[in-house]
Amino acid sequence: MARVTVEDCLEHVDNRFELVMLSTKRARQLATGGKEPRVAWENDKPTVVALREIAEGIVTPEFIAAEEIVTEDPVFAAFEDENNEAV
């Protein structure tokens, strides 16, 4: 298992704050969202896997934004009108 450094991740992310947000969202997806890792799991924790994905350039802010789009979720349907606008 190779160590993941912040510098490795910052080659693919603009700043440390964005890195924190990106890695948090991805780790949460891996831990609770049922998303599959894009790198070998290697018995690591979700946070380490998320950082490895970012360091390899696999996970980007655009990737996370696409994964977060909720389509036709019945929980949110009650809060929209027929024009698909929030009530």
Curated annotation (Swiss-Prot):
EC number of this enzyme: 2.7.7.6
SMART domains recorded: RNA_pol_Rpb6
InterPro entries (alphabetical): DNA-dir_RNA_pol_omega (IPR003716), Pol_omega/Rpo6/RPB6 (IPR006110), RPB6/omega-like_sf (IPR036161)
Top EC class for this record: transferase
GO cellular component term, pick one: DNA-directed RNA polymerase complex
Molecular function GO labels: DNA binding; DNA-directed RNA polymerase activity
Catalytic activity: RNA(n) + a ribonucleoside 5'-triphosphate = RNA(n+1) + diphosphate
PANTHER family: DNA-DIRECTED RNA POLYMERASE SUBUNIT OMEGA
UniProt similarity note: Belongs to the RNA polymerase subunit omega family.
Subunit and interaction comment: The RNAP catalytic core consists of 2 alpha, 1 beta, 1 beta' and 1 omega subunit. When a sigma factor is associated with the core the holoenzyme is formed, which can initiate transcription.
Name by which UniProt lists this protein: DNA-directed RNA polymerase subunit omega
Source species of the chain: Pseudomonas entomophila (strain L48)
Name of the gene: rpoZ
